[in-house]
């Protein structure tokens, strides 16, 4: 086992604080409408330019191991805030730095760290309750646009795009961010249920100019097995031909004779058919087939429950207004499924999201909810260079997470005002069990002014003057650092999602509390590299001439 370096008490805390400040000082320059950029060197390719707090935090690794421990703990604050709400990483870092600095001063003055931590925890619980009380629902498209604009560093085009996307696909719909091809941002919306399986044969194409298959008012048969024998599907084909409607076959696979016969029938115009593979694999495929069945009021023909394809009737087939199939995707538009059943299915999948521990599973389940609930919107980000594209994509991603958080838990006045108001209210009523807890409460409430002060500092103004003016006001009254004006933050469109502010405060206080109560730090001693004896002798080859 490697030898360890151990530091105690104030020596340990001073080192840790130095690491905290290095990381937080690098992150906090990005806060607010006039926050600056940070340039990150990359091993390959061009450097990355960002205003995203967590991206800056992730890059920082310090040489001194004790300082690095402090930096890594604050990095954890930014990461946790990012995971929980997708935004608020810089606010969380600024809060953590403020609480740690204030807390360690109190510890150095001889206060009991455990009582300080209890006081901080009490203050945070009370302020979170107060934030919930002043929060208002985020319902209108205008409010969603404002939240997106603020989170994208006052970029109004991003706010507008996100608001449009949410309007099109609903608040549950999936919105993804991709690289665009031009200079301008664009929004693509896919309505209905789309899955990533294209036609099994190009001979099904009936719109050659677009290279797609389009079926109007088709029947849809869903089969949970491979179809290789045409006899199995013949009864359904005959029934559909009599009904005079097209047919979409969604099966695990269709091969050999069965596929050839379907192609021939389509080319001769006997029956209009298209076939695609079922989306997903294994259990996920079964679940997605069931989703399509509920959306189209059909039944999955599955041998597992004793159903036979040869005995399938028109009643077991789903229907939709329209189906569009490209070589890569199939889109089912306006399935005739029962609204109540679709809602029940969505609720069931949401419960699975709650229970799931895997991020990958959660993402896939969320996609299924979106496909059932409304559709998918794609925001294509445009920029002049790749570096600018990356930076903008990060901002759009942040804004997207912020608007989702706002829809979920509501909005509070932005610009650090919500924390100042909540802290002022709590300060008049909250007391601890002893004097040291009261100090903990006071230092936590004082630290909650830090985001407002940092926003003002980054805008080049005097933080103490603005903080005093904001505290003298009430309600939504605050300072707009973008326009350097005071006024009602909600009316000026300066909004923060309640969830983002709440998460930032809770994670910052949690990690800061652990740091304040640290008394000992242990790390590996650096290993001394021993010289290889053979390498050391390498320079002696020329000694032969000494004789």
From Swiss-Prot:
GO terms under biological process: protein refolding
One Pfam family per UniProt: Cpn60_TCP1
Enzyme Commission identifier(s): 5.6.1.7
Main location: cytoplasm
GO molecular function: ATP binding; ATP-dependent protein folding chaperone; isomerase activity; unfolded protein binding
Residues binding ATP, per UniProt: 30-33, 51, 87-91, 415, 496
Family designation: Belongs to the chaperonin (HSP60) family.
Purpose: Together with its co-chaperonin GroES, plays an essential role in assisting protein folding. The GroEL-GroES system forms a nano-cage that allows encapsulation of the non-native substrate proteins and provides a physical environment optimized to promote and accelerate protein folding.
Annotated protein name in UniProt: Chaperonin GroEL
Gene name for this UniProt entry: groEL
């Amino acid at each position: 086992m490697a030898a360890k370096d151990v530091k105690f008490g104030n020596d340990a805390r001073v080192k840790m604080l130095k690491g905290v400040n290095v990381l937080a000082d690098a992150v906090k320059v990005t806060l607010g409408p006039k926050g600056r950029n940070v340039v990150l060197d990359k091993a390959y390719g061009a450097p990355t330019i960002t205003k995203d707090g967590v991206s800056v935090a992730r890059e920082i690794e310090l040489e001194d191991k004790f300082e690095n421990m402090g930096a890594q703990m604050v990095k954890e604050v930014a990461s946790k805030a990012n995971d929980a709400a997708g935004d608020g990483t810089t606010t969380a870092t600024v809060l953590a730095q403020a609480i740690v600095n204030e807390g360690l001063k109190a510890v150095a003055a001889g206060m009991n760290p455990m009582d300080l931590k209890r006081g901080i925890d009490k203050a945070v619980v009370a302020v979170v309750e107060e934030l919930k009380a002043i929060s208002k629902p985020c319902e209108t498209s205008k409010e969603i646009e404002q939240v997106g604009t603020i989170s994208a560093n006052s970029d109004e085009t991003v706010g507008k795009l996100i608001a449009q996307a949410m309007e099109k696909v609903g608040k549950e719909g999936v919105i993804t961010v991709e690289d665009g091809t031009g200079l301008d941002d664009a929004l693509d919306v896919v309505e209905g249920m789309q899955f990533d399986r294209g036609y099994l044969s190009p001979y099904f194409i009936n719109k050659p100019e677009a290279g797609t298959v389009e079926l109007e008012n088709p029947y849809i048969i869903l089969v949970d097995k491979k179809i290789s024998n045409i006899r199995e599907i013949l009864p359904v084909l005959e029934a559909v031909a009599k009904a005079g409607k097209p047919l979409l076959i969604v099966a695990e696979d269709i091969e050999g004779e069965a596929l050839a016969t379907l192609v021939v029938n389509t080319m001769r115009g006997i029956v209009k058919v298209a076939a695609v593979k079922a989306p997903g694999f294994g259990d996920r495929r079964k679940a997605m087939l069931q989703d399509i069945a509920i959306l189209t009021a059909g039944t999955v023909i599955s041998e597992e429950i004793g159903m036979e394809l040869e005995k399938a009737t028109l009643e077991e087939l789903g229907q939709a207004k329209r189906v569009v199939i490209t070589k890569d995707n199939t889109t089912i538009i306006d399935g005739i499924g029962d609204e109540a059943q679709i809602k029940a299915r969505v609720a069931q999948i949401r419960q699975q999201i709650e229970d799931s521990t895997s991020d990958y599973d959660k993402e896939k389940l969320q996609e299924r909810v979106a496909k059932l609930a409304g559709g998918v919107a794609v925001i294509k980000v445009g920029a002049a260079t790749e570096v600018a594209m990356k930076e903008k994509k990060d901002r759009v991603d942040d804004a997207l997470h912020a608007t989702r958080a706002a829809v979920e838990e509501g909005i509070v006045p932005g610009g650090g005002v919500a924390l100042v108001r909540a802290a002022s209210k709590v300060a008049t009523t909250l007391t601890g069990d002893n004097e040291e807890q009261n100090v903990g409460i006071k230092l936590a409430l004082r630290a909650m002014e830090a985001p407002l002060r940092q926003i003002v500092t980054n805008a080049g103004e005097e933080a103490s003057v603005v903080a005093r003016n904001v505290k003298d006001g009430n309600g939504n009254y605050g300072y707009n650092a973008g326009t350097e004006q005071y006024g009602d933050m909600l009316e000026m469109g300066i909004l923060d999602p309640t969830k983002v502010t709440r998460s930032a405060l809770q994670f910052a206080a949690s990690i800061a509390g652990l740091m304040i109560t640290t008394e000992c730090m242990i790390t590996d001693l650096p290993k001394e590299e021993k010289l290889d004896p053979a390498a050391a002798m390498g320079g002696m080859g020329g000694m032969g001439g000494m004789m």
